[in-house]
Curated annotation (Swiss-Prot):
Species name: Streptomyces avermitilis (strain ATCC 31267 / DSM 46492 / JCM 5070 / NBRC 14893 / NCIMB 12804 / NRRL 8165 / MA-4680)
EC number: 7.-.-.-
Binding site for ATP 2: 347-354
Family annotation (Pfam families): ABC_tran (PF00005)
Protein name as catalogued: Putative ABC transporter ATP-binding protein SAV_5847
Amino acid sequence: MIRFEDVSVTYDGAAEPTVRGVDFTVPEGELVLLVGPSGVGKSTVLGAVSGLVPHFTGGTLRGRVTVAGRDTRTHKPRELADVVGTVGQDPLSHFVTDTVEDELAYGMESLGIAPDVMRRRVEETLDLLGLAELRDRPISTLSGGQQQRVAIGSVLTPHPKVLVLDEPTSALDPAAAEEVLAVLQRLVHDLGTTVLMAEHRLERVVQYADRVALLPAPGAPLTLGTPPEVMAASPVYPPVVDLGRLAGWSPLPLTVRDARRRAGALRERLAATETPTPTATATATAAPAPSPSRPRRPRLLRKRAPVPSAALPVAAVEALAVRRGRVEALRRVDLTASPGEIIALMGRNGAGKSTLLGALVGLVPPAGGSVRVGGAVPHRTAPRDLVRRVGLVPQEPRDLLYADTVAAECVAADGDAGAEPGTCRALVSELLPGVADGTHPRDLSEGQRLALALAVVLTARPPLLLLDEPTRGLDYAAKGRLVTLLRALAADGHAIVLATHDVELAAELAHRVVILAAGEVVADGPTAEVVVASPSFAPQVTKILAPQHWLTVTQVREALA
Ligand SMILES: Nc1ncnc2c1ncn2[C@@H]1O[C@H](COP(=O)(O)OP(=O)(O)OP(=O)(O)O)[C@@H](O)[C@H]1O
Ligand SMILES: Nc1ncnc2c1ncn2[C@@H]1O[C@H](COP(=O)(O)OP(=O)(O)OP(=O)(O)O)[C@@H](O)[C@H]1O
């Protein structure tokens, strides 16, 4: 159904092809997962299927790509639209209409599908993706994950023969990601749909793949195999594979269920070692002294009482209520963050995580209750003063970057922060060695842009650092570097609050997890205790080794050493 014959793509101005000699076939009714480190050309391969490469991106494509027999070089993307549905990395650039319902119908309208069929499919898709309550909402008012659901829904409604998906679950909460993948699998099994999907969070997707295509390094040949074959040698792999390799399991398990069946002996060995402490990973490097009054048990479904802390809190939120349009986005939220503490804010799409971060930087005013950051009330504090107290790296780092070059961005950041000239540039060099002054932020990779936005925010050395979905689009290596950096910042006394759907990141990094549901705090406690209590938010290692309380492969490796 999809066929690559010796394909190379060279972007304009590039000395070398981005991908070369790509040669593989995806038969009808198969789900193939495309994996590899950041920047190896996964999006480029996907773009060659939908025709975006080279028609929209420019550059030269050599060799031949055919989809359902049509050559994508001689057929423009719109001439492929009846067979290929595409979801790109940035849902916002994808939308053509204003409201959820119109967007779901749009693709079908342009293909001339009968009105009664359209109506039925829109209803089905609204239910399938949990969008029914949002059907009349302007898309611009949706949360990041809600937008990603609409983007996926809008390509499903026309029932294309081929789906090309670039990180379709990156903004979805864990339960929604599972639901979307189950829907895709049903389309593949029941309708014979062919799916080619790139994804970094392999723990979410690898078990759904019929085969895995690996681009191991830039310019290296693509290899195709069964998931266990490819995972045995891949430079990117999920925690279940990491644990399997550590324990020497063969064949490698790819699912929690398979790994649990093998884990008996490992559990016994681990039982003889010291049981991990609730914040073992975090305490290994940079935890604040645990305050004796910090709650030891998650307070599921109970209102959290303010806890007096040894260190004066950097942020104190009390009984906060926030309205966004007609929506009560936050209700009765209490939260404190102390110096050196890393807090992961988790919860379903639309639960209010970004809104809470927005309230902490004064972007959204409270409708009730109070927010104090370093003693100031954020929405009443002048930006110049506020940047020295709190900084937010937004879900889309691009939203923070306005200048045409990295150097100009840094000069502006120094000015805004009242910092010594050169402060931001020094941070960029530390975080992003080798990036030239003249580079346009637009041409940076996702991970590089995140690092630049982080440097811009850190220029003012804010005691409170907020990050919204910081691991979107990052590969495991980049995530590892981010973890090291954030731990060092916490050790330096910064309080860090991150909104994330990445349960593996929370397990690795956070001292505390706060779960929001429908605008309210439903759990707040040490990471191990909160995630162990919740199947949705438990990392793979926890599920595999339960009832023991291990969170990460790093902990297990250290215990066995
Ligand atoms: N339109 C373009 N013009 C020039 N260079 C590009 C263009 N699109 C991508 N590139 C470059 O091609 C390389 C591969 O990018 P691509 O987005 O295909 O990688 P990827 O594997 O999808 O990465 P990620 O996992 O970070 O999304 C990168 O170095 C990128 O900078
Ligand atoms: N401008 C707006 N008008 C109306 N409702 C809004 C607006 N902005 C956000 N909302 C709603 O407020 C709720 C909270 O949104 P928020 O972005 O805080 O969620 P989130 O937990 O960060 O979600 P996600 O995980 O999807 O990023 C959602 O139901 C969202 O649709």
